[in-house]
């Protein structure tokens, strides 16, 4: 039998859910199989993320990605022609070495990641397996999903500084049953907001973006929506927040400028404690401190780790080295996993491996600038990721991930069930 190799790698410039250019890559194998992947991009980005190569200049507001596209079509294509598509680590290593920079700044993480993902898709097709099975083998589970239903911070033009208010099902059940609870709560939330006189326009991730005065008001609306949908807050549906505290951290004075208050690290913890006391169904907080405020993050972790999932995003940027540093320092107890923060499938898997080794939960994540690509849905199942956040049950680029999970659950049958945080009987 003739050995299957990579025959061609081709990229093009497409557009994401915010109308910004992004990279699409197609990897064609010698047997004619084609794998395609589309690269997302974030609005709220960490300082240590791999470099998303943009063109600059006047075209498309400087956001064009033709430099990254050309890097795929020339340097990366030349490097990978004839390579083994089934050896993902070797493919990714070759691109990392070809780039030669610590942050993928020469070729662009968007160029490298698109190729990395498309290679995995092509390899799965060539072996006649679903992507989740190719990447994960037989060790699979459906993820617990977190849905951003009220948007603030960088994701919406309103008065709320905390970036995301999410709802998540917390009773062990099928994915479909849990998702239906989320959909019911989402539609009820719209009614609650309308009755209170708020606009119900949508933010980048499909959640509502009401012009509320503070985060407490947003949490009250969520609590009411959960109850009015017929569920018990904390027992059926819980709440999670992505604070994205770097958004309201002032580097000049080292204080947090949050909803009209100027707070130091201890005062910020007191602010969060007030919310946690009022809303016991709040079970998870992401980036509660700035990515450079190690002292604040560590202190908050030590005092809250038994009560709360503390998710590290900007603090680690899906980077194995930064994660190991955070673990050593005692920061957080969960890792947010974004493929485009680090730039290859292999490095992302390594970050997940390190997280699991040290008892950290993992939450696979979309970006605010998304496409219809469903790679992360398969990836969450394949990696036993436990958790996945990919927006509200609205906007096709978000819902398509959930529809893919419905298909996967149907294929897996009744054997695989959600593994919830916190564990529920």
Curated annotation (Swiss-Prot):
Binds a second Mg(2+) ion via substrate during catalysis. The active site is at residues 205, 338. GO terms for biological process: glycolytic process. Signal peptide: none annotated. SMART domains: Enolase_C, Enolase_N. The keyword 4Fe-4S does not apply. Mg(2+) binds at residues 242, 286, 313. Its EC number is 4.2.1.11. Its cofactor is Mg(2+). One of its GO terms (cellular component) is extracellular region. InterPro entries: Enolase, Enolase-like_C_sf, Enolase-like_N, Enolase_C, Enolase_CS, Enolase_N. Keywords: Cytoplasm, Glycolysis, Lyase, Magnesium, Metal-binding, Secreted. (2R)-2-phosphoglycerate binds at residues 163, 338, 367-368, 389. The keyword Cytoplasm applies. Pathway: Carbohydrate degradation; glycolysis; pyruvate from D-glyceraldehyde 3-phosphate: step 4/5. It is found in: Cytoplasm; Secreted; Cell surface. It catalyses: (2R)-2-phosphoglycerate = phosphoenolpyruvate + H2O. PANTHER family: ENOLASE. Belongs to the enolase family. HAMAP family: Enolase. This is Enolase. It comes from Lactobacillus delbrueckii subsp. bulgaricus (strain ATCC 11842 / DSM 20081 / BCRC 10696 / JCM 1002 / NBRC 13953 / NCIMB 11778 / NCTC 12712 / WDCM 00102 / Lb 14).
């Amino acid at each position: 039998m003739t050995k299957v190799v990579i025959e061609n790698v081709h990229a093009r410039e497409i557009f994401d859910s915010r109308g910004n250019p992004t990279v699409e890559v197609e990897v064609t194998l010698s047997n004619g199989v084609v794998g395609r992947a589309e690269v997302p991009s974030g609005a709220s980005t960490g300082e240590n993320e791999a470099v998303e190569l943009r063109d600059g200049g006047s075209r498309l507001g400087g956001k064009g990605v033709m430099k990254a596209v050309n890097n795929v079509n020339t340097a990366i294509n030349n490097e990978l022609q004839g390579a083994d598509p089934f050896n993902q680590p070797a493919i990714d290593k070759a691109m990392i070495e070809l780039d030669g920079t610590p942050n993928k700044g020469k070729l662009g993480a968007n160029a490298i990641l698109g190729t990395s993902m498309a290679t995995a898709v092509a390899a799965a097709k060539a072996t006649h397996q679903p992507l989740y099975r190719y990447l994960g083998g037989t060790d699979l589970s459906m993820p617990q999903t977190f849905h951003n239903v009220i948007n603030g911070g960088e994701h919406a033009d309103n008065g709320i500084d905390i970036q995301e208010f999410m709802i998540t099902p917390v009773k062990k059940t099928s994915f479909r049953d849990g998702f239906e609870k989320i959909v019911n709560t989402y539609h009820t939330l719209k009614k609650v907001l309308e009755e209170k006189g708020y606009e119900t326009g949508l933010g980048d991730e499909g959640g509502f973006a009401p012009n509320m005065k503070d985060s407490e008001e947003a949490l009250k609306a969520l609590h009411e929506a959960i109850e009015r949908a017929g569920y018990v807050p904390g027992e059926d549906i819980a709440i999670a927040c992505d604070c994205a505290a770097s958004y309201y951290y002032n580097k000049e004075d080292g204080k947090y400028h949050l909803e009209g208050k100027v707070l130091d690290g201890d005062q910020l913890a007191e602010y969060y404690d007030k919310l946690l006391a009022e809303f016991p169904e709040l079970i998870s907080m992401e980036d509660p401190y700035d990515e450079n405020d190690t002292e604040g993050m560590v202190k908050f972790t030590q005092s809250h780790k038994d009560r709360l999932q503390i998710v590290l995003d900007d603090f680690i940027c899906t980077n194995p080295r930064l994660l190991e540093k955070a673990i050593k320092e005692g920061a957080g107890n969960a890792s947010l996993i974004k493929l485009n923060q680090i730039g290859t499938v292999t490095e992302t898997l390594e970050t997940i491996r390190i997280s699991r080794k040290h008892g950290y939960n993992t939450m696979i994540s979309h970006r605010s600038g998304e496409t219809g690509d469903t790679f992360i849905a398969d990836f969450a199942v394949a990696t036993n990721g436990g958790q996945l956040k990919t927006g509200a049950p609205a906007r096709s680029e978000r819902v398509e991930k959930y529809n893919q999970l419905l298909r996967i659950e149907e294929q897996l049958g009744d054997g695989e069930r959600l593994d919830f945080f916190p564990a529920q009987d």
